[in-house]
């Protein structure tokens, strides 16, 4: 009789939200936002693989690929508004810490923060 193979559990954590009344001087600065995403990955104990950014109108969209998943920021300076999504796999990561670092750096006066457990069920 063969033994049962036990697969390691996938631990997925996602923190996402909307940031209001942000510092407009930061929201349109692609290079500054790239640095914020890089530092957020470090704060969340994630392994940064690559960062891509696009200037779209006055705003910027940033996608950071981390070994554990991704971090995104999309900004609308004309509305002092940004959205942020931090998703990571692995018990060693802290997407909440990365999200809150971004909130602080964008100087959001108010924000929503949602958390989702994206772990496996097997």
From Swiss-Prot:
Q: Which UniProt keywords apply?
A: Autocatalytic cleavage, Decarboxylase, Lyase, Polyamine biosynthesis, Pyruvate, S-adenosyl-L-methionine, Schiff base, Spermidine biosynthesis, Zymogen
The chemistry this enzyme catalyses reads: S-adenosyl-L-methionine + H(+) = S-adenosyl 3-(methylsulfanyl)propylamine + CO2
A Gene Ontology term for the protein's cellular component: cytosol
Positions bearing the site annotation: Cleavage (non-hydrolytic)? 68-69
Q: In which pathway does it act?
A: Amine and polyamine biosynthesis; S-adenosylmethioninamine biosynthesis; S-adenosylmethioninamine from S-adenosyl-L-methionine: step 1/1
Q: Which InterPro entries did the record assign?
A: AdoMetDC_fam_prok (IPR003826), S-AdoMet_deCO2ase_core (IPR016067), S-AdoMet_deCOase_pro-enz (IPR017716)
Gene Ontology biological process: spermidine biosynthetic process
What domain of life?
Archaea
PTM details?
Is synthesized initially as an inactive proenzyme. Formation of the active enzyme involves a self-maturation process in which the active site pyruvoyl group is generated from an internal serine residue via an autocatalytic post-translational modification. Two non-identical subunits are generated from the proenzyme in this reaction, and the pyruvate is formed at the N-terminus of the alpha chain, which is derived from the carboxyl end of the proenzyme.
The Swiss-Prot or TrEMBL record annotates one GO molecular function as: adenosylmethionine decarboxylase activity
Active site residues of this protein? 69, 74, 89
So which cofactors does this thing need?
pyruvate
Q: How is the cofactor bound?
A: Binds 1 pyruvoyl group covalently per subunit.
The protein's Enzyme Commission number: 4.1.1.50
Task: List Pyruvic acid (Ser) occurrences by residue.
Answer: 69
A Pfam family matched in the record: AdoMet_dc
Outline what the protein does.
Answer: Catalyzes the decarboxylation of S-adenosylmethionine to S-adenosylmethioninamine (dcAdoMet), the propylamine donor required for the synthesis of the polyamines spermine and spermidine from the diamine putrescine.
Q: Which NCBIfam families match?
A: SAM_DCase_Bsu
Q: Which family does it belong to?
A: Belongs to the prokaryotic AdoMetDC family. Type 1 subfamily.
The protein's assembly and partners: Heterotetramer of two alpha and two beta chains arranged as a dimer of alpha/beta heterodimers.
> What is the protein named?
S-adenosylmethionine decarboxylase proenzyme
């Amino acid at each position: 009789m063969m033994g049962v193979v036990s697969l390691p559990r996938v631990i997925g954590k996602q923190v996402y939200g909307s940031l209001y009344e942000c510092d407009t001087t930061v929201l349109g600065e692609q290079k500054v936002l790239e640095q914020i995403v890089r530092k957020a990955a470090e704060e969340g104990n994630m392994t940064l693989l690559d960062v891509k950014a696009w200037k779209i109108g006055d705003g910027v969209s940033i996608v950071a690929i981390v070994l554990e998943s991704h971090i995104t920021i999309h900004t609308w300076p004309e509305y002092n508004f940004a959205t942020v999504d931090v998703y990571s796999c692995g018990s060693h990561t802290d997407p909440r810490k990365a999200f809150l670092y971004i909130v602080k750096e964008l100087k959001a006066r108010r924000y929503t923060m949602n958390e989702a457990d994206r772990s496996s069920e097997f």
